[in-house]
């Protein structure tokens, strides 16, 4: 069995009137994230991790923000495309660990729904998906509530 590891990172700034979607879950908040797509910083980081694990580039190469076809795109569909590329290379998700870095809103009430959504996109069981959140103790752009960041690390296994 071959094992590959990928890391993804994404950031979006606050300032949109679009709904806030994180990990495929709509979260009530007074503003959304500015982005060409739906702005799901969590699924963008996960997509980059999956693509990176198999040396398939990054989300920007596959879905450029200069391409109007992806304006308002559902990030779950982008991740599903990345997963299909992995399946073509005969790899599946071993496990994934996600860290959301945000001062607000509180993520705890939404973690289980995010785990379920991510597991569905990755075609894996929820036990293979971990999502956690932290703040920056009011430091930096996240602490000033200018945006949200997300890290994702994925282990992919050959089948």
From Swiss-Prot:
| Keywords of this entry | Isoprene biosynthesis, Lyase, Metal-binding
Q: Which InterPro entries match?
A: MECDP_synthase (IPR003526), MECDP_synthase_CS (IPR020555), MECDP_synthase_sf (IPR036571)
- Catalyzes what? 4-CDP-2-C-methyl-D-erythritol 2-phosphate = 2-C-methyl-D-erythritol 2,4-cyclic diphosphate + CMP
Q: Does the keyword Signal apply?
A: no
Tell me which residues bind a divalent metal cation: 10, 12, 44
Q: Which GO terms describe its molecular function?
A: 2-C-methyl-D-erythritol 2,4-cyclodiphosphate synthase activity; metal ion binding
The protein's required cofactors: a divalent metal cation
Protein origin, superkingdom: Bacteria
Report the EC code(s) recorded for this entry.
Answer: 4.6.1.12
Key word Iron-sulfur present: no
For this chain's record, the cofactor binding note is: Binds 1 divalent metal cation per subunit.
What pathway or pathways are given for this protein in its record? Isoprenoid biosynthesis; isopentenyl diphosphate biosynthesis via DXP pathway; isopentenyl diphosphate from 1-deoxy-D-xylulose 5-phosphate: step 4/6
NCBIfam families per record = ispF
Its biological purpose: Involved in the biosynthesis of isopentenyl diphosphate (IPP) and dimethylallyl diphosphate (DMAPP), two major building blocks of isoprenoid compounds. Catalyzes the conversion of 4-diphosphocytidyl-2-C-methyl-D-erythritol 2-phosphate (CDP-ME2P) to 2-C-methyl-D-erythritol 2,4-cyclodiphosphate (ME-CPP) with a corresponding release of cytidine 5-monophosphate (CMP).
Q: What family does this belong to?
A: Belongs to the IspF family.
Protein name stated in the entry: 2-C-methyl-D-erythritol 2,4-cyclodiphosphate synthase
**Which lineage do the record's taxonomy fields give for this organism?**
Bacteria, Pseudomonadati, Pseudomonadota, Gammaproteobacteria, Alteromonadales
């Amino acid at each position: 069995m071959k094992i590959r590891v990928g890391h993804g990172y994404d950031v979006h700034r606050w300032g949109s009137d679009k709904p806030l979607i994180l990990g495929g879950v709509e979260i009530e908040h007074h503003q959304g994230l500015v982005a060409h797509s739906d702005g799901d910083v969590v699924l963008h980081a996960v997509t980059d991790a999956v693509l990176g694990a198999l040396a398939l580039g990054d989300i920007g190469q596959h879905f450029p923000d200069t391409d109007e076809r992806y304006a308002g795109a559902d990030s779950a569909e982008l991740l599903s495309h990345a997963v299909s590329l992995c399946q073509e290379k005969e790899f599946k998700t071993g496990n994934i660990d996600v860290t959301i870095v945000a001062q607000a809103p509180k993520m705890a009430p939404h973690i289980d729904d995010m785990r379920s959504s991510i597991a569905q996109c990755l075609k894996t069981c929820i036990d293979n998906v971990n999502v956690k959140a932290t703040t920056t103790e009011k430091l930096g752009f996240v602490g000033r509530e200018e945006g949200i960041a997300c890290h994702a690390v994925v282990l992919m296994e050959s089948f």
